[in-house]
Amino acid sequence: AATDATNATAPLLITDEANNIAVFEAASPSVVFVTNTQLRRQRFSLNVLEIPKGSGTGFIWDDDGLIVTNFHVVYGANKINIALQSGQQFEAKVVGTSPEKDIALLKIDAPKEILSPLPLGNSDALAVGRKVLAIGNPFALDTTLTVGVVSALGREIKSMNNRTISNVIQTAEAINP
């Protein structure tokens, strides 16, 4: 009888909600928090301070420690820190950038067994109206999920250095609070 009462009060998940939860639980370990600091020397004491410059989200590309993030997140950094979902932190080195595509590739030295690379998909079957999920760390809030749709395909936008980025997938989901 106790089991019946527990089941009666537990909320039922619709299939879409159950799928969202499953995707979130599967992908979250692959999402990382990226912080960018710059070194500044104080004028009078000449002490060197680490000043937070920015933060963002990235994902684990492979078990060799490669991380993909946005170029604007790491631009101008003297030091880049990666926080895994487990709370473990690692200093990262930039191994490649594409400012015109707003992409940066970072590398951390972490044991393979603690890294969870994100399985990659194929965008060929995307269509306007398809559901999308985004997991990020807005304003240093950890592991936020948002749901939206593909709004358009093949868009062109301007990068930080005013170059055109072609074939962009436009989505409608807000990750910020």
What are these regions (language model features)?
Residues 1-177:
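Serine-dependent protease modules
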